[in-house]
Structure formats: structure tokens, C-alpha cells
Design a protein with these regions (language model features):
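Generic structural signal for small/hydrophobic residues in well-ordered secondary structure
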Residues: 4-7, 54, 68, 92, ...
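Conserved PLP-anchoring active-site segment centered on the Schiff-base-forming lysine
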Residues: 66, 84-106
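N-terminal small-domain helix-loop-helix segment of the aminotransferase-like
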Residues: 1-73
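Short, solvent-exposed loop/turn segments at secondary-structure junctions
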Residues: 7-11, 75, 99, 148-150
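Active-site phosphate-binding strand-loop segment of PLP-dependent enzymes
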Residues: 120-167
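Glycine/Thr-rich phosphate-binding loops of Rossmann-like dinucleotide-binding domains
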Residues: 12-14, 78-79, 102-103, 151-152
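A short helix-loop-beta submotif of the ANL/AMP-binding
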Residues: 108-114
Length: 167
């Protein structure tokens, strides 16, 4: 099935990618283990100058430059957060519609991804009972945008507290 409204390619796991290309995964991993990293393209967490500038936005001392991580756009930031928190055996619940990476990044990494769909017949309001049923002891994260993108529905204090209580 092809989704013409999708803005991203289908996510692949590493083993699927290597099956697709015919490359040897073990040989690749061995090459990576022995590769010289003497060249340098910059700090992976962002340039010290940019990190200092971001930290400087906040009251002095509240945020240190070494606590700031610069990512390559919002997708990179979402990937960092999702993959830092989620592990095999976990699941996450995504309130849709949402950004595609919110459900494709964990799904592509083998994380069970459950969906709670906002519905027109409910005026796109979050069904808290459905959210509660979607969560279990292995739910590590509830992913939502607020206000929702693309619909624009906003969860205010009471609704956000309900989400926290369910989590």
C-alpha cells in the first residue's frame, strides 16, 4: 500500500537494510570497530560556540553549555529523544495525527507502537479512555503534539493532567 500523503520513506531496521543491499552486516560492523576516526567534522553534540549561545539565553548558571545538545532539525531531536528513552520490549503510544517520525522512528527500531486516533466524530478531542486502554506496564512513552499538528486541537491543564495520570 502506498500513502501518497506521506512525507517520509518507510523506516527500515538495520537487518532489513542489509538484506536489501546484500551487504554483510558482520563485515560492516567489524569495519566500523576498526575504522580510524582521526578526521573530524565537528562535535557531534553541536559546536561549543552555538551551545554557549543557547545556554546564554537562560538565566546565568541555570543551563550550562555542556548540557545543551544541538541536533540536525526537529526530526533529529525527535529521534534522539525517542531512541534515548525506548528500548526493546517497551511500547509507546502515539496520538495521531502527528508527525510521521513520532510513530515511524520507534516502529522502525522494533518498538511496539500503539496509536490513539483523534476522530472527527469526537471533534478531534482526545479519548482518554482509549488512551488509558492503549497503555500498559510496558508503555514507556506517550507521544503527542500540543497543540496538535496538523489539527490544532489543544490540551489545556486539565487534559494534560489526565495524560500525566494515565502515564
Amino acid at each position: 500500500r502506498i500513502n501518497l500523503g506521506s512525507s517520509c520513506v518507510s523506516a527500515l531496521r538495520m537487518d532489513e537494510l542489509f538484506d536489501l543491499t546484500g551487504e554483510d552486516l558482520d563485515a560492516f560492523l567489524n569495519e566500523m570497530r576498526t575504522m580510524s576516526l582521526h578526521y573530524h567534522h565537528g562535535d557531534a553534540t553541536g559546536s561549543p560556540r552555538i551551545k554557549a549561545a543557547v545556554a546564554g539565553i537562560y538565566p546565568k548558571g541555570n543551563v550550562k553549555p555542556e548540557e545543551v545538545m544541538i541536533t540536525h532539525g526537529g526530526t533529529g531531536a525527535n529521534d534522539l529523544v525517542l531512541m534515548s528513552v525506548l528500548e526493546p520490549g517497551d511500547n509507546c503510544v502515539v496520538i495521531k495525527p502527528s508527525y510521521q517520525q513520532h510513530y515511524d522512528i520507534p516502529k522502525g527500531s522494533g518498538i511496539e507502537t500503539r496509536v490513539v486516533q483523534l476522530k472527527a466524530e469526537d471533534n478531534y478531542q482526545l479519548d482518554f479512555d482509549a488512551l488509558d486502554k492503549a497503555c500498559d506496564a510496558n508503555t514507556k512513552m506517550i507521544v503527542l503534539t500540543n497543540p496538535n499538528n496538523p489539527i490544532g486541537v489543544t490540551l489545556y491543564d486539565e487534559g494534560l493532567r489526565k495524560v500525566v495520570d494515565i502515564a
